[in-house]
């Protein structure tokens, strides 16, 4: 009787579904669509750059009003712009603005004072164009985080609106923060935050866990206003406690899914992207004494499988093939052992 050979093809899904790597920060946001002046409109708020590296002398700031029906940007608009702390509702900067062109443009210089430098209309609106942007010194963008930009459209083409609409937007600016961890030697890591500053980094050598603490308001009404919380770790591959082991991601000690990208030559990038629904669910799960912060945790797990393409199937060994981001594993073995005739 011929020996019956079975080729067993084992597919191991490591991370829920295949996901692409997420980009850095928003830096750009569009409002909800509102109907006024016989058309549907939305407002776009944008900054340049979208991620801070700590050496920026000024930040580009641009506001555009888009006619959603005609899909074009509207010119000759007067605004009331109010930039607010989204957690407490306090106004940081408020001013009247005007652009004869398609977009209102300003340069914001991060300082602990408020000062405007530019031209005004006869109606005392600050003018900002691409060729001559308004310069504003203000306590804004001194670090990465979330700001609320409320844009009230007062007039279009010199015609005042009887009931000026207010567009509310939440704008996220990222920031790269370098830090060090010492285990057997000193390692240089990077953390990217797209929501708020980081109060503390800590590595627990006994538990082999890395954490970053970020202030956060877990009030459910506030959480429902934000689309998601985004953060990233950049870990050198020389750090074997994470490179040679599987990585478990946690938020306030609750295990969550995320993206772990090992495709780079020198570093591992771990992405936290927590949407609104997950944040609301986490509110009921996290320890009550952590309702004032988010703790982004990485735990070193079991030794991970590595690519193995020189195995002998006939001797009962297995071939292991990994996808680029290692979110899919393919294990190939023969049962029973022996040659394929």
Regions found by a protein language model. Give the residues of each.
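N-terminal signal peptide
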Residues: 16-22
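N-terminal soluble domains immediately following signal/targeting peptides that reside
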Residues: 22-233, 237-341
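A detector of low-complexity, intrinsically disordered, Ser/Thr/Gly/Pro/Ala-rich segments
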Residues: 1, 15, 331-333
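Bacterial N-terminal signal peptides
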Residues: 7-16
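Bacterial N-terminal signal peptides that target proteins for export
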Residues: 1-7
């Amino acid at each position: 009787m011929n020996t019956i050979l079975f080729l067993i093809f084992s597919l191991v899904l490591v991370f829920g579904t295949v996901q692409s790597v997420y980009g850095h920060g928003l830096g750009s946001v569009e409002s909800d669509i509102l109907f006024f002046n016989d058309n549907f409109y939305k407002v776009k708020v944008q900054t340049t750059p979208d991620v801070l590296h700590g050496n920026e002398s000024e930040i580009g700031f641009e506001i555009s009003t888009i006619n959603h029906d005609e899909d074009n940007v509207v010119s000759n608009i007067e605004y009331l712009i109010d930039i607010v702390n989204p957690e407490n509702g306090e106004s940081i900067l408020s001013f009247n603005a005007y652009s004869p062109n398609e977009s209102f443009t300003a340069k914001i210089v991060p300082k602990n004072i408020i000062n405007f430098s530019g031209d005004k209309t006869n109606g005392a609106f600050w003018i900002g164009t691409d060729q001559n942007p308004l310069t504003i010194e203000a306590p804004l963008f001194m670090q990465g985080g979330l700001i609320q930009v409320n844009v009230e459209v007062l007039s279009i083409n010199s015609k005042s609106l009887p009931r000026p609409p207010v567009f509310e937007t939440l704008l996220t600016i990222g920031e790269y923060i370098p830090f060090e961890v010492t285990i057997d030697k000193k390692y240089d890591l990077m953390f990217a935050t797209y929501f708020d500053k980081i109060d503390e980094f800590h590595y627990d050598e006994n538990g082999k866990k890395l954490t970053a603490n970020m202030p956060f308001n877990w009030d459910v009404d506030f959480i429902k206003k934000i689309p998601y919380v985004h953060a990233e770790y950049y870990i050198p591959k020389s750090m074997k406690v994470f490179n040679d082991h599987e990585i478990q991601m946690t938020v306030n000690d609750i295990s969550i899914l995320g993206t772990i990208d090992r495709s780079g030559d020198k570093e591992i990038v771990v992405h936290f992207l927590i949407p609104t629904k997950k944040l609301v669910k986490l509110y009921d799960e996290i320890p009550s004494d952590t309702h004032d912060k988010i703790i982004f945790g990485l735990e070193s797990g079991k030794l991970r499988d590595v690519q193995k393409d020189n195995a002998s199937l006939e001797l009962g060994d297995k071939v292991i093939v990994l996808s680029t981001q290692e979110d899919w594993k393919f294990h190939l073995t023969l049962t029973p052992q022996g040659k394929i005739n």
